[in-house]
Swiss-Prot record:
Organism, as annotated: Pyrococcus furiosus (strain ATCC 43587 / DSM 3638 / JCM 8422 / Vc1)
EC number of the protein: 5.4.99.12
Gene field: truA
InterPro entries according to UniProt: PsdUridine_synth_cat_dom_sf, PsdUridine_synth_TruA, PsdUridine_synth_TruA_a/b_dom, PsdUridine_synth_TruA_C, TruA/RsuA/RluB/E/F_N
Binding site for substrate: 106
Protein name per Swiss-Prot or TrEMBL: tRNA pseudouridine synthase A
General function of this protein: Formation of pseudouridine at positions 38, 39 and 40 in the anticodon stem and loop of transfer RNAs.
Highest taxon, organism lineage: Archaea
Catalytic residues, chain numbering: 51
Length: 266
């Protein structure tokens, strides 16, 4: 039996997703819980290995096991801190959560004070479609051509939410796009300059810096023909926890805004 699990976590409590020696990671926390529960498994895979500080509402992992207890989220949730399993689906044995994904949806949260949302929306149109995102990512050897399907921006409760959807993303790509939208909306980064950068015309020393990881949330990963059974109790528990913890991010983002604007003026 192969299962896909929807997981949420507070990324500020970990040193990233991927297991590393001597530090706490999301993958390490899940594997430890599986071991403590005595659940034997194989072929463990993840959809997205988020960076340190980045949280998730809807990341997905998959594993193969004959232990039916995996279908009860509380078996692992009771053994983990800062990670919550809230959805499960039985999937084909060759299912890979990263390669089978249609799109990923990220949300970034910013304090709305001083934000020109109308201008941010205008700037966001420049990123739609297929471009070279080397100026808006931390290059790691992968092909830098990527496609953005959708960007939506709205304000709610004194917070600006930037939602970005696409097939796949480069390292720090979403966070750097958010930085560019903020700078563009405030007149620091011209739209013409963004177009040039998306065509590969930029100085490496003048790349747009990434927004802080604490404001980024991997909201969802979409699949065809994969129906997750939702555990509402686990989902609500995560939602309560993350709202309290994200309150701190508002002050961090305000500090980031001051720093990035001053950096551009130096």
């Amino acid at each position: 039996m192969r299962v896909a699990l929807k997981i949420a976590y507070d990324g500020t409590k970990f040193h990233g997703f991927q297991r590393q020696p001597n530090v706490r990671t999301i993958e390490g926390e899940i594997l430890r819980a599986l071991k403590d529960a005595g659940i034997e498994f194989e072929n463990f895979k993840s959809a997205s290995r988020t960076d340190r500080g980045v949280s998730a509402r809807g990341n997905v992992i998959a594993l193969s096991t004959e232990d039916d207890r995996i279908k009860n989220p509380m078996v692992l949730n009771s053994r983990m801190s800062d990670v919550w399993i809230w959805g499960i689906a039985e999937v084909p044995e060759d299912f890979h959560p990263r390669f089978w994904a249609n799109t990923k949806v990220y949300r970034y949260y910013l304090p709305s004070l001083g934000m020109n949302i109308k201008k941010m929306k205008e700037c966001s149109l420049l990123f739609l479609g297929t471009h070279d995102f080397s100026a808006f990512s931390r290059v790691d050897g992968r092909d830098t051509i990527r496609s953005i399907d959708r960007i939506e921006i709205w304000e709610k409760c004194n917070v600006v939410v930037v939602e970005i959807e696409g097939k796949s993303f480069l390292w720090e790509m979403v966070r750097r796009i958010v930085s560019a939208l903020v700078l563009c909306s405030q007149g620091v980064l011209a739209e013409e300059r963004i177009v040039e950068m998306l065509n590969g015309k930029f100085e490496k020393s003048r790349k747009v810096p990434p927004a802080p990881p604490e404001g980024l949330l991997l909201w969802d990963i979409k699949y065809e023909n994969v129906e997750f059974q939702i555990d509402n109790a686990s989902l609500k528990k995560f939602q309560r926890e993350i709202v309290e913890r994200f309150k701190l991010h508002a002050s961090l983002s305000a500090l980031y805004e001051d720093l990035i604007l001053n950096e551009q003026k130096i």
